[in-house]
């Protein structure tokens, strides 16, 4: 199985500043066609996870363009350019390259 690794907590950030989340996979998530099957989800308190980014860098429908995704085959970053209070929650990266699909342990966004 592909192992997805994330830090449990982010560095505390101030509202209006940027935040970054890192994720590493134990195997490349890039297919031969060049598509990278790395997905990012946000689980807000008391809610189900919502898709933020698909195929490493594509913004899901309805997600503010404050969010962006980047990376390589195994190392990935989710960035929020201007953190808002509504962004609080746990951010998960996921391997949708091969079964079984696997998730990182999640990184909790900490606000100062």
From Swiss-Prot:
Keyword Magnesium: no
Chain spans, region Framework-2: 40-54
Region: Framework-3, residue numbers: 62-93
Pfam families the record matches: V-set
Annotated S-S bridges: 23-93
GO biological-process terms attached to the record: adaptive immune response; immune response
InterPro entries: Ig-like_dom, Ig-like_dom_sf, Ig-like_fold, Ig_sub, Ig_V-set, IgV_Light_Chain
Keywords: Adaptive immunity, Disulfide bond, Immunity, Immunoglobulin, Monoclonal antibody
Region (Framework-4): 103-112
Record-annotated membrane-spanning stretches: none
Region (Complementarity-determining-2) location: 55-61
Alphabetical list of Gene3D superfamilies matching this protein: Immunoglobulins
Extra remark: This chain is from a hybridoma-derived monoclonal antibody against the streptococcal group A polysaccharide.
Name of the molecule in the record: Ig kappa chain V-II region 2S1.3
Species this chain originates from: Mus musculus (Mouse)
């Amino acid at each position: 199985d592909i192992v997805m690794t994330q830090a449990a907590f982010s560095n505390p950030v101030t509202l209006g500043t940027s935040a970054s989340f890192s994720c590493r996979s134990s195997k490349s998530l890039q297919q031969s066609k060049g598509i990278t099957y790395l997905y990012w989800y946000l689980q807000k308190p008391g809610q189900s996870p919502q898709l933020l980014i698909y195929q490493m860098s594509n913004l899901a429908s309805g997600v503010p363009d404050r969010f962006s995704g980047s990376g390589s085959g195994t190392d990935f970053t989710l960035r929020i350019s201007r953190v808002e209070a509504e962004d609080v929650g746990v951010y998960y990266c996921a391997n949708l390259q091969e079964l079984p699909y696997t998730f990182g342990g999640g990184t909790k966004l900490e606000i100062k």
